[in-house]
């Protein structure tokens, strides 16, 4: 039962001394697909088709850097003794919450420079972000990482999973929870929900609901994982950040409705976001 017949090599192919990993390919596919999805919403909103190019470029770049910095900070005892490992990103070690923080800051700065409404842009890209995250989790599967605790093969079979997933969750003589799959399904479900309800939401609420939906799923799924970044022996960083994001997002939705009463996106089949700045 422990023999893996369909083991997936994390390396897709080699270009001379360079190994191209499935992880990087899948992340790139997620970003590109998210970009094309956002472009459709961008056109409906009446913005120029090139509006997102700089935003996505700088958000992806600084998000990636921040994701690495975030991981290193919470694993500092190891990296303090092995500083040369900090730049060796190919050895693994990025954190999605760090990426979200870095990408968010970069995106807001670009919006301000280009005189764009960050709430409007956030609403446009939110479904794309969670879709890209759902796709990106399959990169963890290819790397045989970010899995949950030990389970039996019988448990995995009861989930009616394809054999290639079951067999590749057999790592170091043990089967594990496919937490990558749980989160991928949760994220794709979030994408479907957001694209179907955003025209009924007010300015900024699609983005805040994205943060809320993602954080709820991440909180519970994180509890199953074995590789969590820990703040203390009992507190997982991702769970703490998820709680904070849920509270902040819901509070901002309520606050903005009371304080500003932003416009409602009510036109059926359209995304009538204003192109002027809205508080």
UniProtKB/Swiss-Prot annotation:
MF terms (GO), sorted A to Z: phosphatidylglycerol-prolipoprotein diacylglyceryl transferase activity
Protein topology in the membrane: Multi-pass membrane protein
EC top class, as a word: transferase
Cell compartment(s), UniProt: Cell membrane
Major localisation: membrane
Any one GO biological process: lipoprotein biosynthetic process
InterPro entries attached to this UniProt entry: Lgt
Gene Ontology cellular component annotations, sorted alphabetically: plasma membrane
Biological or metabolic pathway of the protein: Protein modification; lipoprotein biosynthesis (diacylglyceryl transfer)
Positions of a 1,2-diacyl-sn-glycero-3-phospho-(1'-sn-glycerol) binding: 137
E.C. code: 2.5.1.145
Spans through the membrane: 18-38, 55-75, 89-109, 203-223, 235-255
The entry's keywords: Cell membrane, Membrane, Transferase, Transmembrane, Transmembrane helix
Transferase keyword on record: yes
Keyword Translocase: no
Positions in coiled-coil regions: none
Pfam families: LGT (PF01790)
The family this protein is said to belong to: Belongs to the Lgt family.
Task performed by this protein: Catalyzes the transfer of the diacylglyceryl group from phosphatidylglycerol to the sulfhydryl group of the N-terminal cysteine of a prolipoprotein, the first step in the formation of mature lipoproteins.
Protein name: Phosphatidylglycerol--prolipoprotein diacylglyceryl transferase
């Amino acid at each position: 039962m422990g023999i893996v017949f369909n083991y997936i090599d994390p390396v897709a192919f080699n270009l001379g001394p360079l190994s191209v990993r499935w992880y990087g390919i899948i992340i790139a596919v997620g970003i590109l697909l998210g970009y094309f999805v956002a472009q459709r919403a961008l056109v409906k909103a009446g913005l120029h088709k090139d509006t997102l190019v700089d935003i996505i470029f700088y958000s992806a770049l600084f998000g990636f850097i921040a994701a690495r910095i975030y991981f290193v900070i919470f694993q500092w005892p190891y990296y303090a003794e092995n500083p040369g490992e900090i730049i060796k990103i190919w050895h693994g070690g990025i954190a999605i919450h760090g990426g979200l923080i870095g990408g968010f800051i970069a995106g807001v700065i670009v919006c301000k420079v280009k005189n764009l409404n960050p709430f409007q842009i956030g609403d446009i890209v939110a479904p794309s972000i969670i879709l890209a995250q759902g796709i990106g989790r399959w990169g963890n599967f290819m790397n045989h990482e970010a899995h949950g605790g030990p389970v039996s093969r019988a448990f995995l079979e009861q989930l009616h999973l394809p054999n290639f997933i079951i067999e590749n969750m057999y790592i170091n003589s043990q089967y594990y929870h496919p937490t990558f799959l749980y989160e991928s399904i949760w994220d794709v479900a979030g994408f479907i929900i957001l694209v179907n309800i955003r025209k009924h939401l007010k300015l900024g609420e699609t983005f805040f609901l994205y943060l809320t939906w993602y954080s709820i799923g991440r909180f519970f799924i994180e509890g199953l994982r074995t590789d969590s970044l820990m703040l203390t022996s009992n507190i997982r960083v991702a769970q703490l950040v998820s709680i904070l994001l849920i509270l902040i997002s819901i509070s901002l939705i309520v606050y903005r409705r009371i304080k500003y009463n932003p416009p409602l996106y009510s036109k059926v089949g359209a995304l009538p976001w204003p192109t002027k700045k809205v508080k």
